[in-house]
């Protein structure tokens, strides 16, 4: 069951948000969320590292790793879930929203030196290379090829296997909007 955050957990969240705020895209995301009143709760029993519910505006975090001084996993999870909170929720394109969020997290992690030891990211790296820094497609054939490979990767993961994908939603609009004024 969910519980409110302890002061140690809040400190972790504040540190992660401060780090994110030092990144152009992360700062834009935090700025866009200031009036959203997102609630953050802890639930060690969820399947994913984090979940965002657009109906309740609630973010659930699985693990705060209180024993560690810094928590890059939490920072990555917060970045991912906060990005979801800015996306236009669409059950028919849920997998597209995941791919967009994972791509943004991949680029954030590269900028911040955060490790991504996860097989999900091998084709995301290649998908990223088909886009410029503002998420515009620079090589359509590569983009379509690697987007399909990323879909195939995600469909092998239990958590995502039933998520719907829509070819018309392969646009990265949330990322484009956040990155447009970043260098």
Listing of model-derived features with the role each one plays in the protein:
Residues 76-89:
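Active-site recognition of the HExxH zinc-binding catalytic motif
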Residues 30-72:
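Catalytic zinc-binding patch centered on the HExxH motif and its immediate surroundings
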Residues 1-21, 95-183:
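Active-site or metal-binding loop neighborhoods of secreted/extracellular toxin and effector enzymes
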Residues 2-3, 63-68, 89-92:
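Second-shell loop/turn segments in exported
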């Amino acid at each position: 069951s969910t519980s409110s955050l302890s002061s140690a957990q809040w400190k972790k969240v504040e540190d992660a948000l401060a780090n994110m705020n030092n990144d152009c895209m992360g700062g834009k995301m935090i700025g866009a969320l200031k009036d959203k009143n997102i609630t953050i709760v802890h639930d060690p029993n969820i399947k994913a590292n984090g979940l965002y519910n657009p109906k309740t505006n609630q973010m659930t975090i699985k693990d705060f790793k209180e024993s560690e001084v810094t928590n890059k996993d939490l920072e990555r999870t917060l970045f991912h879930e906060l990005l979801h909170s800015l996306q236009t929720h669409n059950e028919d394109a849920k997998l597209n929203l995941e791919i967009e969020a994972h791509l943004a997290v991949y680029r954030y992690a590269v900028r911040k030196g955060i490790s991504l030891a996860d097989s999900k990211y091998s084709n995301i790296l290649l998908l990223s290379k088909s886009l410029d820094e503002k998420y515009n497609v620079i090589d359509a054939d590569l983009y379509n090829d690697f987007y399909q490979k990323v879909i195939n990767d995600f469909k092998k993961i239990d958590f995502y296997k039933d998520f719907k994908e829509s070819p018309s939603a392969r646009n990265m609009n949330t990322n484009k909007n956040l990155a447009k004024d970043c260098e």
